[in-house]
């Protein structure tokens, strides 16, 4: 009776036990027509995102002066880089740690640059301090202290602005450092995705990443609540919504799907074990989502500057024309005298 029952059970695949990501050729060999079409469409969407960003970066570089153009280019690069790294991770599953490291670096810089853009759109640091110098800063905002309504309001001065900038700069610095440490420990087997035991470094690195992330988001939230009424005509609410959308999808969505993969909710389907299949699904979702974010960013940031640049170019041409007329008139007056 027992041998017959054993014959009816499906054979156990060792891939599900090792939980090791497959090589790229193993993925490609197991693709059906639907999988091939999906790979082609997602790769095409990634290429379109890259081309849209390059065109937008060229436009910003030519039309907008420094340092505003570099800040906006960095912000627009975030979604494109997440889509690109996700595409590489989809094609090469074993590169997930390295693609996640690259995406996290760009995300950290994106959050810091977005806060700098809020100050820059107010006219710079001096204009920002003169505009909001008499305003009290509300620090009981999400995601860190939204429930602590009893927190006092702070005066806005150079020290306050420096602390807010430090809140995002620490994330731009520490997040790449922590992810680099995770990659190094992963090669040694000390860092394992989904392993929450205290003996492994995974849980401690994840706690550090979580603290730095929440602190940076808190600083940006405080700054946004302060300037949003003054920057409504500059589409700042839409830009902030897209920024939040990018952060939530690249962080919260990824964490939830990875937890589902490590707990077995997303099951093993050879050649992909559970955690690798979860990363595989998340990468495909991120490509589609970041494609939409790239297109929306182009609309928001491009439309904002078209009319302004047109007026600036007209003013520059008028000033140049007036200067040339003045120089020509002066030359005609001075010519006979010099002779």
Swiss-Prot record:
Residues 1-32, 92-97, 187-202, 276-283 are extracellular. It is found in: Cell membrane; Endoplasmic reticulum membrane. GO terms for biological process: bile acid and bile salt transport. Glycans are attached at residues 6, 188, 195. The chain crosses the membrane at residues 33-53, 71-91, 98-118, 166-186, 203-223, 255-275, 284-301. GO terms for molecular function: protein heterodimerization activity; protein homodimerization activity. PANTHER family: ORGANIC SOLUTE TRANSPORTER-RELATED. Its main location: membrane. Residues 54-70, 119-165, 224-254, 302-339 are cytoplasmic. It is a multi-pass membrane protein. This is Organic solute transporter subunit alpha. Essential component of the Ost-alpha/Ost-beta complex, a heterodimer that acts as the intestinal basolateral transporter responsible for the translocation of bile acids (such as taurocholate), steroids (such as estrone sulfate), and eicosanoids (such as prostaglandin E2). One of its GO terms (cellular component) is protein-containing complex. The gene is slc51a. The keyword rRNA processing does not apply. It comes from Xenopus tropicalis (Western clawed frog). Keywords: Cell membrane, Endoplasmic reticulum, Glycoprotein, Lipid transport, Membrane, Transmembrane, Transmembrane helix, Transport. Belongs to the OST-alpha family. Interacts with slc51b. The Ost-alpha/Ost-beta complex is a heterodimer composed of alpha (slc51a) and beta (slc51b) subunit. It catalyses: taurocholate(out) = taurocholate(in); prostaglandin E2(out) = prostaglandin E2(in); estrone 3-sulfate(out) = estrone 3-sulfate(in); dehydroepiandrosterone 3-sulfate(out) = dehydroepiandrosterone 3-sulfate(in).
């Amino acid at each position: 009776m027992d041998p017959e029952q054993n014959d009816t059970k499906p054979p156990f695949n060792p891939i599900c036990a090792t939980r090791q990501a497959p090589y790229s050729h193993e993925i490609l060999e197991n693709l059906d027509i639907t999988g091939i079409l999906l790979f082609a469409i997602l790769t095409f969407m990634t290429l379109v995102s890259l081309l849209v960003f390059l065109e937008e970066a060229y436009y910003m570089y030519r039309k907008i002066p420094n340092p505003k153009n570099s800040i906006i280019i960095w912000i627009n690069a975030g979604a494109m880089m997440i889509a690109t790294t996700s595409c590489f991770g989809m094609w090469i599953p074993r590169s997930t740690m390295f693609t996640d490291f690259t995406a996290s670096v760009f995300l950290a810089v994106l959050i810091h640059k977005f806060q700098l853009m809020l100050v820059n759109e107010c006219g710079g640091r001096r204009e920002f301090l003169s505009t909001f110098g008499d305003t009290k800063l509300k620090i009981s905002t999400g995601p860190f202290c939204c429930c602590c309504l009893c927190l006092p309001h702070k005066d806005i001065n150079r020290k306050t602005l420096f602390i807010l900038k430090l809140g995002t700069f620490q994330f731009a610095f520490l997040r790449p450092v922590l992810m680099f440490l995770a990659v190094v420990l992963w090669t040694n087997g000390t860092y394992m995705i989904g392993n929450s035991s205290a003996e492994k470094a995974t849980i401690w690195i994840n706690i550090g990443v979580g603290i730095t992330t929440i602190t940076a988001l808190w600083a940006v939230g405080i700054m946004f609540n302060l300037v949003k009424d003054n920057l409504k005509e500059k589409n700042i609410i839409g830009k902030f919504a897209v920024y939040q959308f990018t952060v939530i999808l690249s962080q919260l969505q990824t964490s939830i799907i990875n937890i589902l993969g490590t707990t077995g909710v997303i099951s093993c389907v050879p050649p992909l074990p559970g955690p690798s299949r979860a990363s595989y699904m998340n990468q495909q979702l991120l490509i589609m989502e970041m494609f939409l974010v790239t297109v929306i960013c182009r609309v928001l940031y491009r439309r904002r500057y078209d009319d302004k640049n047109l007026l600036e170019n007209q003013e520059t041409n008028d000033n140049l024309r007036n200067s040339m007329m003045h120089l020509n008139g002066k030359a005609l007056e001075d010519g006979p005298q010099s002779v």
